[in-house]
Amino acid sequence: MKLHRVVLVVALLLATATGKAQSFALKTNALYDLALIPNIGAEVALGKQWTVSADWMYTWFSSNNRHRYWQGYGGYLTVRRYFGSQTSDLRPLTSAFSGHHLGAYVLGLTYDVEWGGRGYQADHFGFGGGVEYGYALPVSSRLLLDFSVGIGFQDGEYKEYTPQDDHYVWQSTHKRHWFGPTKAEVTLKWVLGKKGGAK
């Protein structure tokens, strides 16, 4: 529950920052949407090339009689530096979020996944972080398509279990120390705010 409070505080800080920020964007990762993981994020421009964002995902699908679980929630906090054109006259709102970008992020995630056989449950948050690279392409005056990948680490503990009748039988507990891809995004980003932004 503590992570929920952290995300709420960050969201409030992002909302407060929009008054001083050049622009503000709401976004969703289409890859998670396709995987039936609803998600939403917010990104705030801090000056002309830096942004900070918070993303949250949550899914809670289950079918006890068929032993199907697709559950999890968590999110990312990310700081980015954009290297795109920051002086676009055609799309002034999206200019702070366009072009190549590098970033650093931290993440927290918990899940319970089982599809009729062995299940995997992380009932406590696993944490990690990494670095990312991406490219954001303006589609219209307010809409961008952002592609990004991240490499980093994730630590945590998870349990393996098997369904037997109406019970779930614990099999083993494992520590996860993962290094590799920890983030992938094809994000639709909708920019809000007034044209011209802060000077």
PLM segments and residue spans:
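Hydrophobic, lipid-facing positions within transmembrane beta-strands of outer-membrane proteins
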Residues: 24, 36-40, 56, 73-77, ...
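Extracytoplasmic loops and strand-loop junctions of Gram-negative outer membrane beta-barrel proteins
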Residues: 23-25, 114-118, 167-172
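Solvent-exposed loop/turn segments connecting transmembrane beta-strands
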Residues: 25-41, 58-59, 63-70
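Outer-membrane beta-barrel "beta-signal"
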Residues: 74-84, 178-199
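Gram-negative (and chloroplast) outer-membrane scaffold detector with strong preference
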Residues: 46-143
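Sec/Tat signal peptide C-region and signal peptidase I cleavage site
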Residues: 17-21
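Outer-membrane beta-barrel pore domains and translocons
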Residues: 31-33, 57-59, 105-109, 150-154, ...
